[in-house]
Structure formats: C-alpha cells, structure tokens
From Swiss-Prot:
It is an enzyme of class 5 (isomerase). This is Trehalose synthase. It comes from Thermus thermophilus. GO terms for molecular function: maltose alpha-D-glucosyltransferase activity; metal ion binding. Catalyzes the reversible interconversion of maltose and alpha,alpha-trehalose by transglucosylation. Substrate binds at residues 60, 101, 165, 195, 305-306. The gene is treS.
Amino acid sequence: MDPLWYKDAVIYQLHVRSFFDANNDGYGDFEGLRRKLPYLEELGVNTLWLMPFFQSPLRDDGYDISDYYQILPVHGTLEDFTVDEAHGRGMKVIIELVLNHTSIDHPWFQEARKPNSPMRDWYVWSDTPEKYKGVRVIFKDFETSNWTFDPVAKAYYWHRFYWHQPDLNWDSPEVEKAIHQVMFFWADLGVDGFRLDAIPYLYEREGTSCENLPETIEAVKRLRKALEERYGPGKILLAEVNMWPEETLPYFGDGDGVHMAYNFPLMPRIFMALRREDRGPIETMLKEAEGIPETAQWALFLRNHDELTLEKVTEEEREFMYEAYAPDPKFRINLGIRRRLMPLLGGDRRRYELLTALLLTLKGTPIVYYGDEIGMGDNPFLGDRNGVRTPMQWSQDRIVAFSRAPYHALFLPPVSEGPYSYHFVNVEAQRENPHSLLSFNRRFLALRNQHAKIFGRGSLTLLPVENRRVLAYLREHEGERVLVVANLSRYTQAFDLPLEAYQGLVPVELFSQQPFPPVEGRYRLTLGPHGFALFALKPVEAVLHLPSPDWAEEPAPEEADLPRVHMPGGPEVLLVDTLVHERGREELLNALAQTLKEKSWLALKPQKVALLDALRFQKDPPLYLTLLQLENHRTLQVSLPLLWSPQRREGPGLFARTHGQPGYFYELSLDPGFYRLLLARLKEGFEGRSLRAYYRGRHPGPVPEAVDLLRPGLAAGEGVWVQLGLVQDGGLDRTERVLPRLDLPWVLRPEGGLFWERGASRRVLALTGSLPPGRPQDLFAALEVRLLESLPRLRGHAPGTPGLLPGALHETEALVRLLGVRLALLHRALGEVEGVVGGHPLLGRGLGAFLELEGEVYLVALGAEKRGTVEEDLARLAYDVERAVHLALEALEAELWAFAEEVADHLHAAFLQAYRSALPEEALEEAGWTRHMAEVAAEHLHREERPARKRIHERWQAKAGKA
C-alpha cells in the first residue's frame, strides 16, 4: 500500500445517521451505508469520512461522546461496523477521534465528579471561573463562559465548546493513554485514518489563549508515533485546526506530526474571490499555505457539517461575507454562515461548477460533503447547524427514499419546500440525466482520479495574469503539466497567459482531448461567465495521435461505415467507471448495440446497452471481459470479450474505430483465439478484481495448440471444450450445478470455469471440461453435413414415393433418433434430480446444447431453469432439425425443394417416435406440439428474418391455424 495514498484521495464526508436507513427506524445506519456503497463508487470518491457514530446523548450531533467503544444503537452494532466491503471497493475509511472533550454523561466524567476520585484529574477543574481569564468563548451564541459549575463536584469544569462537553485534561498521562487505546481499538477494526476533532484546545496554560500550545503539538507527535509503531505507515491523522496557516503549520512538524490538516482560511476566501470577482483572496491564502513537509497535505473543502466559519478572516472580510452570502440573520450562527453549497451560491449552476473545479484542482485533497454532489439545500429553521445535516435525498418519494419510517419518526425532516425540495433535487432524478449536477461531478471526479498524482502531489505555480478576474495556475508532477484557468467574473473575459516558458507545447483540453494551437509566447484565451478550462501541456510529438477537429477527419473508405468512438486515452477510460469518459462510453455502447442487433444467437435486438462491469483480462493488447445489460421490450444480460487494438487485425468482430487514441474495437465471441487464451489463463489459475466483483477461474485440463469454434460461445480443441456464457440467463449456473448429478455416460461434466463473485452472489461466466478423442462438431452443423450427403439421393424421384425417405435419409434419421432417445433419458434424469413439482424441468435449449463426436451425441449445456411440458423441448430441437433441412436445401439444387416439408415431417416423426419409445410413460399431445412449434418458429423469426426461418414460420403458423 502506498503510504501517501491520502494525497490521491477524494474524501466523501457523510453522517451515517443522515445517509440511508435500512431498518426503517428513522435513523441512518451502517447497513444502509453498506447498501449505498455502489453509489459512492460510481460517484468516484475513494475515501469515506464518517462523522461520529459512537454512543452519545446527541446534544451536539454525536460530538458529545459517552462511550468511545460503543456504537449508538440507532446506527447498528459493533458487528455491523465493518470496513471490508469498502476496502473491497478500493475505499479507505476515516472516522472521528474526539479527543478534546467528552459528554457529561461519559462514565469518566461521572466518576471524576466524585470527591477524592482517582479520576478527578481526567478533567480540568477550578474553584473559580476567573482562571484562564481572557480565553475566547467559541460558541458565543450559546455560551457566555468556558466554565460551568458542577454541584456534585462543588467546582467549575472547563469546556471550550458547549457546557455539556467537559474538556479532558491532557496533562494527565492516564488521559493520553486512554485516548491512544481508543485509537488502537478502531484501528484494529481496519479504520484507515482519524480526524482529530478540535485539536488546538488540548492544553490550558495561564496567560495564553489556550490554543495551539507547544504541549499540544508534542501530544500530536506522540499520537502519530504510537500509531506508526503499532501499525507501520499507512494510517493517517487529519487535524481539524481552524487557525491561520502559520498557526497550523506546526501541527505537521517535520513530517512527524499530522499527515493532513484542513485549510480553513482558504475556504471563505474562495467565496470572497467569487463575489468580488478578484483572485486576490485565493492567491494570498495559497501563498500563506506554502512550506509544509513533503509528506504532508492540505485538506480542501467548500462546505461541511458546521457553519461556513468566518473565524479566520478580518473584521472587514467578515462583514463583506455576511452581506454577500447571509444578509438574512437566520443564516448566521456563531462566527459563520449555516448554509449548504448550492443555496450559498444562489442556485447558480455556473458558479457551482467553477468552485467545484477549484476544489478538485487546487493543491490538496478535496472533501465533498454528502448531498452537495446533487445540489441539496438546507433548512434554517432547524436548530443549531442541523439545517445542513438533513436526510440524503435519494428520490422524490414521501421521505426521499431515505427511510420507510413514519415521517414523524425521522431524526430530522428532509428539505421539502422551495427549489431544493426533495421533489426536485434527488439522486434518482439526476442519475440518468447526463446534464445533471450528479453527472457533472461524476465526470469531473473521473478526470481527477485519472490524473490523481498531478492534482494530489504536483506543485502549484500561480500565473501572473494581468486580468485579475482570472485565476490561472500550473500543476506539475514528474514531467506532466496541467494548466487550470478560471473566470471569477459573471461576464465573459479575454486574457493573455504568460506561457513563454512553455513555448512549443500544445494545450490539450482534458475533458474532450481536443488539441489547441501550440504555445508561441503569450497565449490568448477567452472564458465565458464563471467558466473554467483544464489543459494538459504536451510536446507536439505526444499529441500526434490526437484527432483533428471532427469536421477535418477523413476515415479510410473501407472504414467509413464503422461507428466512431472518442477515446481520450486507453480503453480504460471507456470501460472503468472511476476513469470514465462519458461521451466516449456512450458512443462505444451505441456501437455495441448496433453490432449486437446483427447477432443471430441473441434473442433480443437491443435499443440500449448499459455496462454493468468490466475486467481487464489481458493487458497488451487490452482485452476486457464485460458484463452488459441489453434493453428493448425486456432486459437481458450478456457477457462479451472486447479487445482494443491500435492496428487493424485479421479476424472477426470489428465493430468500431476509435479516435483520440486511434485504434479499433473487436467483439471476440466468434474468435477461436480468444477461447484458447481463456483456457490458457484459467490453466494458470486466474484471479482478478474489477470495481464490482472478483473473477476467479481454473482449468485442470490441457490447453490445446488449436481451438475450433463450434458455435458462438462454444469452442473445442484436442480433448477439451470451453463454453462462454454469452447470454447470462442462468443456463451455465444450472449446467455447473446439475450436469455432475446426471448419471448418464454421454453428459460432459464441467471440470473448470470462470466465476464472477460479489459478496454472496456468484455466477458462472465460462465452463471447461474434457472430451473423448476425435473431432467434435456442434450437433446442428453435424446434422447439416449429413443432410448435404443424404438429400442428393432424392434426385430423379417424385415426392411421396413410398419407401424413398427411409433409405435416402438413413444416416440422418439415425442421428435424429439418437437425439430423441437422448432427450427422453435426459428428461427422466432431470425429473429425478430437480423434481417435477410445478412442471417438468426442461432442457430449455435447441441443438446447441449438444455436441456430435464420432457418431455419438453428447450433452454439454442446459438452458436456464424452466418448468413446463416436454413438448416445448421437443419443439425447440425439432425446429433446429427442420432449419438444418432448409439450410441444406438452399445449398443444393432447386428441384429438391419439393421435398422440404416431406423430409422435415419424416425426421420429426422419427424424432418423436424415438422419444416415445425411450420414455413411454410421457404422453405427448399433438395440439401442444403444434402450438409450441409455431411459437418457437415465431421466436426465431423475430431474432433474424432469413428465408429459412420465414418459410418454417409460415408453415407452422398455417398448421397451428388448422389445429
């Protein structure tokens, strides 16, 4: 693990209580958070900061802790607190370490109140409230003094915050030891970091401000030392130090203090610069924040669970901020403004996007407050700061899909009135809208993650642009450069960038990957109101692969009809959610939908294709196993191997060309080489991890030199078969489960495979097994070969000639009869294994379920679990027999067409007679048989309108009409 992971992080701050209620008691809980991890993963955050969830009387939203080792029951139990699933998704977890104070209900304080208690010095006591006179009161709206008299102790106790939060006495070694033990307890449970709440106030000394004392700095260093001695590097401390930069710098030490600290003074000055339309406040604070150790990092934020603090601004600046952002006094609290981000910006989308761009590109680790990604609002009429801590707005239902508890049972009411009401602002409404705030944030976070090192670890150089309404800076890391420009004005601005030092480099816009003219000196740009732009500065030779403007691109004539897909990077930017380029993915999925409409094996012509998962199966050239959802009149999931190649290659499956990164996409379901690669990787013992699931596989058998494709999804080589579950309908899962239990010598039992695993869910993506010696064929192909040999014997004879067909079709009829016997024995075995309650278990597939090898018929696959009448299975196989007749006749002389129906009926009769003889107890219904044949014929015609399918459909529709 990279011990500097926190520099590349995107932190999502949430209150478990506010996020999602799984047990419907009105309070969010850990199970609710677990269920919403996929949403956070899709959003693109990779670190969770959980606000206090410990035992507490909740007088200060959980920051008043009464037991550090217990979880507040409304959130769940200690058993519910597990970081495993978050870690499995690549997410870190940071929790609160409230080490300055406890609740008055904490057993430590209750014991300390008693006369002569050995725990008396765990808190700060005085006989007079005059001690530490002159130390400021932080919550002036609620407290008049830092001392409160306790009648039990007959003394005053010290509290820097609320009266019910007595400060711990860090001069007591026992207190420090106890807090270390609390930290160890949660770190042992897998927590990756701790936010040190209210850290500047640990010690008190007469004649000082009792803030940022040297003793506090040393205590922080001891805390880090204890953490690293026990766990090594990798777990972090994030300090809440609401101070000026020069007061915060000592907390970093020489790299032996905290790993991160909030840049509190920068945050209000971002809002100040926006309203003043002048970059000065931002530049000033960025310069003040320089000089931290190489391993340290600033944490950046726009809003959080507290007020927008104006403690660290001048009196004039505070007056300006109140007038600009909170003219109504009800939005003011303590020395700050209690508003969420979007209302603070007056609902202005451009200003929101601009500030988000600054948050994600300035030097530091960004923190996103829950709900701000969709533009949630606030409720100033709730007490204290609760107005910005309301339930997450998941949908527009009565209580925002946060909980099914009665409305009155909710811990806080959701925002239900005005433009930020959950009726209008919710995840459900924004998730599928590519123009929503949520989609904007997902795209930007994907870009941030794609360039995590430069934004998280790179240097920042401010550019001296003459136009002060424009903020411009360069981020550089290990030879990579990104230029960020932002217009703080509500009007369009033109400006010149002093880029003389970068002459010859080409600015490439990061979102579109569109190259701009090379730098030749001062660089003229124009940005719209509150606009921003990000450019990678690259050498000319590094951008030769990038596209010319779309209107100038001329594809080769043979590629003119190929769909174009914009791919600004490797295929991961289209297939990996955290790196995704939305426009390119949409173009890729549209191209896939187009090619899948042409697949005869697919029983659905998709109007829309969605990517559910993707695993990189091979690095060079990049090959991904994808799980797709197809939509039309119904939904269907398929698994397809997709390969991207920078050069055009021989072989099937080409379906799109890429620009940005020029190359070609191939769908490999018909490529024999892919199936050999699959066997080879499984032979090694394959294990991989996508964003969604684990992929594990094995193949105990040999890997043949050559593999032949028998049909889409099924391939075989010498002694080996491999089957890919192209259609994920559960058929392979049933095959793996049931075939080993069938006591039939002609059943090919699976011996290996590839499996998709996510928690308790598991599905089979591929199966492998052994074959007897010989050259196998798909049974449909084998039947067609026999027909091509048999049908020419009918030349010169008239249809209806007695005794003609049994002699001419002897070999074909023998194969069909064998198939009838096999199906009968299979039905009997399936009934014994799966039971017959609710209908007979069916094969559920056509001839593709079987292989032919040296005249023998082998079962290799079952369809999805289905129950019904045996006539349905008989019809599926009989339809394939009849289609083989038509395809063979299409390849022969026209004069033989007169025999089409007679040959089909003869083979059907042989098939049914063989089935009846092998399973006499199963009574077949002629009417049911005819109806099922008509239904199967209609289904196949819907898949693909070819002449053979059309003729068969017309014949059976006529028969069904007569029946």
